[in-house]
Amino acid sequence: MALCCFAFSAPCLHLRSRRSCSSCFLLATSAAFFSARLLRRAFSSSFLFKYSAVCFSSSFSRSFFRFLFSSARRCRSRCVSPRGGAFSPGGPRRSRPRLSSSKDSKPSSTASSSSLSFNSSSKDNSPSTNSSTSRSSGHDTGKHRNSPADTKLTMLIISPLPRVWTESSFRIPSLRVWRLCTRRLVPHLWGTMFGPPTSSRPTGHLSRASDHLGPHRWTRYRLSSTVPYPSTPLLPHPENL
């Protein structure tokens, strides 16, 4: 982005002609194209697989959450005045919907939570009582008005993150999955531990402890395992070398 902005804006400051601006635009579009290609290459599956452990470590997520909390608080302190909110005379610049003083009118959708909390706190809904309470306890009412907004802002930013950036999705698979994978990938290693008796083996193979366990061992192995006995040459035990 910085490269695009520089390529597009820097020569236009010095040369005001249309030709230079068009050439700058071509430069900017080409830079954007190449940067998009580089980004696509950077976010390839191999790159993400390599650096996922670094990016999604617990320290990274902790610092990311801390940054989000601080930015949310900064945004709230900019948007909401420290004293009294909309009730104070030196309130924020942006216009807030005021509370309605009539009995029948409903509060607006933008200030529904704050106006509801204010109306529930005051039992008498007459216009004089509403105005007097808002004038007298402006500080407390402002606090009540601002706290739901703060909670909403924090929840809006923070709540979807644990579902997306959990470490559990990048964990090493469980022992059962690992065993299943290795049993299929390296069948001769699995065959060294559980093998059929000598009668069903090809002649000239090396003798092992599993050869002398009898036929019941072979039937048990056949029923329990999903992998047939491998036809690959078996690895010899170290005592037979």
From Swiss-Prot:
Look up the further comments and give them. HTLV-1 lineages are divided in four clades, A (Cosmopolitan), B (Central African group), C (Melanesian group) and D (New Central African group).
Q: Say which domain of life the source belongs to.
A: Viruses
Q: For the region Disordered, what residue ranges are annotated?
A: 79-151
Consequence of changing D140G = In strain: Isolate LAF
Function recorded in the entry: p30II is a multifunctional regulator that sequesters EP300/CREBBP and down-regulates CREB-responsive element (CRE) and Tax-responsive element (TRE) mediated transcription. Specifically binds and represses tax/rex mRNA nuclear export. Since Tax and Rex are positive regulators of viral gene expression, their inhibition by p30II reduces virion production, and allows the virus to escape the host immune surveillance and persist latently in an immune-competent host. p13II increases mitochondrial permeability to monovalent cations, producing a rapid, membrane potential-dependent influx of potassium. This could involve a channel-forming activity. Interferes with cell proliferation and transformation and promotes apoptosis induced by ceramide and Fas ligand, probably using the Ras signaling.
Similarity comment: family membership: Belongs to the HTLV-1 accessory protein p30II family.
Which residue ranges have biased composition labelled Low complexity?
79-100, 107-136
Per the annotation, the residue ranges of the short sequence motif Nuclear localization signal 1 are: 73-78
Q: InterPro entries recorded for this chain? A: P30II
Q: Which GO terms describe its cellular component?
A: host cell mitochondrial inner membrane; host cell nucleolus; membrane
Where, by residue number, is the motif Mitochondrial targeting signal? 175-184
Motif Nuclear localization signal 2: where in chain? 91-98
Source species: Human T-cell leukemia virus 1 (strain Japan ATK-1 subtype A) (HTLV-1)
Q: How does it assemble?
A: p30II binds to the KIX domains of CREBBP and EP300.
Q: Please provide an example of a Pfam family that matches this protein in its UniProt record.
A: Deltaretro_Tax
Q: Which UniProt keywords apply?
A: Apoptosis, Host membrane, Host mitochondrion, Host mitochondrion inner membrane, Host nucleus, Membrane, Repressor
Q: What is this protein called?
A: Accessory protein p30II
